[in-house]
Amino acid sequence: MIVNYLKNKFYNLLTTMIVLFIFVLSGAIFLTFLGFGLYGLSRILIYFRLGDFTYNRSMYDNLLYYGSYIIFGYFIIFAVEHLMDYFRKMLPENAYFRGATFHLISYTVATTLFYFIIHLNYVYINIDFWVIMVIIGFLYVCKLQFYPESKNLNNRK
């Protein structure tokens, strides 16, 4: 009886450890690819003299500085998109929350808030507003292309 209990406990622990390992490994791979992508983007901006990144301390300081810039920016854009979706659900008949006008308003509000709330506070990152508009616009178009307005697949009626 105790042997079976320990065997089941070990099996559950082993299964949990395998799932946790896969989760951590996939997260590490994602963060590595994200880091390489952002490193490549920063090199492109520097090469074409569209951006200047002057914060250069230790690896962990750089990771914290530039990482917080990206995370705070993502939070702002995420919050604006969800707020705009909430407004669209609450006001479905409003012309501003349909079609291209909705996407233009979402993009404009997200870009403006990112610039004034996040970007201006990071003095070691110098990127012009129009470059930020192009980058966020490209990301917004990719989001619309790869994640279209889909239905909730969990609602079974």
From Swiss-Prot:
User: Mostly located where?
Assistant: membrane
Question: Which keywords are on file for this protein?
Answer: Cell membrane, Membrane, Transmembrane, Transmembrane helix, Transport
| Entry's localization field | Cell membrane
Q: Which GO terms describe its cellular component?
A: plasma membrane
| UniProt keyword Transferase present | no
Q: Which residues cross the membrane?
A: 18-38, 63-83, 100-120, 122-142
Q: Which family does it belong to?
A: Belongs to the multidrug resistance efflux pump SepA family.
Full protein name:
Multidrug resistance efflux pump SepA
